[in-house]
From Swiss-Prot:
HAMAP family: Ribosomal_uL24_A. Pfam families: KOW, Ribosomal_L26. Part of the 50S ribosomal subunit. One of its GO terms (molecular function) is RNA binding. Belongs to the universal ribosomal protein uL24 family. One of its GO terms (biological process) is ribosomal large subunit biogenesis. One of two assembly initiator proteins, it binds directly to the 5'-end of the 23S rRNA, where it nucleates assembly of the 50S subunit. Located at the polypeptide exit tunnel on the outside of the subunit. It comes from Korarchaeum cryptofilum (strain OPF8). Keywords: Ribonucleoprotein, Ribosomal protein, RNA-binding, rRNA-binding. This is Large ribosomal subunit protein uL24. NCBIfam families: rplX_A_E (TIGR01080). One of its GO terms (cellular component) is cytosolic large ribosomal subunit.
Length: 131
């Protein structure tokens, strides 16, 4: 059994030093109300290919597909949310996964299907509905 600390400094230290297989779990995002009722789960680790809606910050209300997940910096990039650099090139704006809501799950991933099955969802029905 691992003892957890309540100290904010130790919580930050854990985030900075967390191994990559823990970082994926930490980078979970809540599901939309529709998906919550459909799958019976509140949140799931975010992955490339999911459709998300930004709920906080300057880009609130923007919806798009996740184009990259940066586990080192705990940020995601969403298609359509870009910032123009001084030389004119566009770069994706990093967004924290807790500030978005997943509106559509990417279900072509076998690991994601196994995860949903573990949580009690019948994946065959899901795949048929999404196609």
């Amino acid at each position: 059994m691992q003892v957890k600390s309540h100290k904010p400094s130790k919580q930050r230290k854990y985030l900075y030093n967390a191994p990559i297989h823990h970082r994926g779990k930490i980078m979970s995002a809540p599901l939309s109300e529709e998906l919550k009722s459909k799958y019976g789960i509140n949140s799931i680790p975010i992955r490339k290919g999911d459709r998300v809606k930004v709920m906080r910050g300057d880009y609130r209300g923007t919806e798009g597909e996740v184009i990259s997940v940066d586990r080192k910096r705990y940020r995601i990039a969403v298609k359509g949310i870009v910032r123009r650099k001084a030389d004119g090139t566009e770069v994706p704006v990093p967004i924290h996964p807790s500030k978005v809501v997943i509106t559509k799950l990417y279900l072509k991933d076998e690991a994601r299907k196994r995860l949903l099955e573990r949580k009690g969802v019948k994946v065959e029905e899901i795949v048929e509905e999404s196609e």
